């Protein structure tokens, strides 16, 4: 079964997120558990935690269907020790919030070397940052998102994702989230079914599908191989509809959150309905 949804707002309280997801016909959703542009947040209260869990149960969302995203400020590969510690503390807090909420995944951007340390050193710092957080939490998997490779961001090559995983001690609690826009901008072609098969065959060999714990389904305003991160609505960008139809009809993408971060929330319900329809078309073929 495919879990299909979008990154919904938690404005007014975390318990509002499941309701907003249900309103657009989603069977999965992503959210921020705190303000993504601030370092600190008030601790979760028992009431907030209970309300969120009750809402998830009411709208039939299990932890496997929810892909929280951490703060954009965090850089787990930061070259400066003080800033690295600040990011590690914030990441641990994000992991602990997920643990409190009964969530089992935390999606994050791996990190940037800021042109100050070698790529290999940055990747090693990211892996060690994950190890530190995993040692102090239980039940939450750290889900590394591939990037477009903009600026000094790492994680844009499958080999980089594999290198981070290789440095993580508890392989059972690390995974990846593949963002289609980011992959395309990083030079992984997705414009035809044949291109999709080639790209994901490469992913399977280098990273492994056993580590795929979620996806972000986004078309791309940015050009192929441009290393520029610009999302677009499905079928309106440079990737086109074929990739998303192909994903919907491939069983390797079952049972994980498939999350829209496309640019027009007003048509998320339509995009979700279209994605669902591709599965039906395959079943009837």
Curated annotation (Swiss-Prot):
InterPro entries: AP_endonuc_2 (IPR001719), AP_endonuc_F2_Zn_BS (IPR018246), Xyl_isomerase-like_sf (IPR036237), Xyl_isomerase-like_TIM-brl (IPR013022). Its cofactor is Zn(2+). Its EC number is 3.1.21.2. One of its GO terms (molecular function) is DNA binding. The keyword DNA damage applies. Zn(2+) 3 binds at residues 182, 229, 231. GO terms for biological process: base-excision repair. It comes from the Bacteria. Binds 3 Zn(2+) ions. Zn(2+) 1 binds at residues 69, 109, 145. CDD domains: AP2Ec (cd00019). Endonuclease IV plays a role in DNA repair. It cleaves phosphodiester bonds at apurinic or apyrimidinic (AP) sites, generating a 3'-hydroxyl group and a 5'-terminal sugar phosphate. This is Probable endonuclease 4. The gene is nfo.
């Amino acid at each position: 079964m495919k879990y299909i949804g979008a990154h919904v707002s938690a404005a007014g309280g975390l318990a509002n997120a499941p309701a907003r997801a249900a309103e657009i016909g989603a069977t999965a959703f992503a959210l921020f558990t705190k303000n993504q542009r601030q370092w600190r947040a008030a601790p979760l209260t028992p009431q907030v935690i209970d309300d969120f869990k009750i809402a998830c149960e009411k709208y039939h969302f299990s932890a496997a269907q929810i892909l929280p995203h951490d703060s954009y400020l965090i850089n787990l590969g930061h070259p400066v020790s003080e800033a690295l510690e600040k990011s590690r503390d914030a990441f641990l807090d994000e992991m602990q919030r997920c643990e409190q909420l009964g969530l089992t995944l935390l999606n994050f951007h791996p990190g940037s070397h800021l042109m100050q340390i070698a790529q290999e050193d940055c990747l090693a710092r990211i892996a060690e940052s994950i190890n530190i957080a995993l040692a102090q939490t239980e039940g939450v998997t750290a889900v590394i998102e591939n990037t477009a490779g903009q600026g000094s961001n790492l994680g844009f090559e499958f080999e980089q994702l594999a290198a981070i995983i290789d440095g993580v001690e508890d392989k059972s609690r690390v995974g990846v989230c593949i963002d289609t826009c980011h992959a395309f901008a990083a030079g992984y072609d997705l414009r035809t079914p044949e291109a999709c098969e080639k790209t994901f065959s490469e992913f399977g060999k280098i990273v492994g599908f056993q580590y795929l714990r979620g996806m972000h389904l986004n078309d791309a305003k940015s050009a192929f191989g441009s290393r520029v991160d610009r999302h677009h609505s499905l079928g309106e960008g440079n990737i086109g509809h074929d990739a998303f139809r192909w994903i919907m009809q491939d069983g390797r993408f079952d049972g994980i959150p498939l999350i829209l971060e496309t640019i027009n929330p007003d048509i998320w319900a339509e995009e979700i309905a279209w994605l669902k329809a591709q599965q039906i078309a395959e079943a009837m073929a």
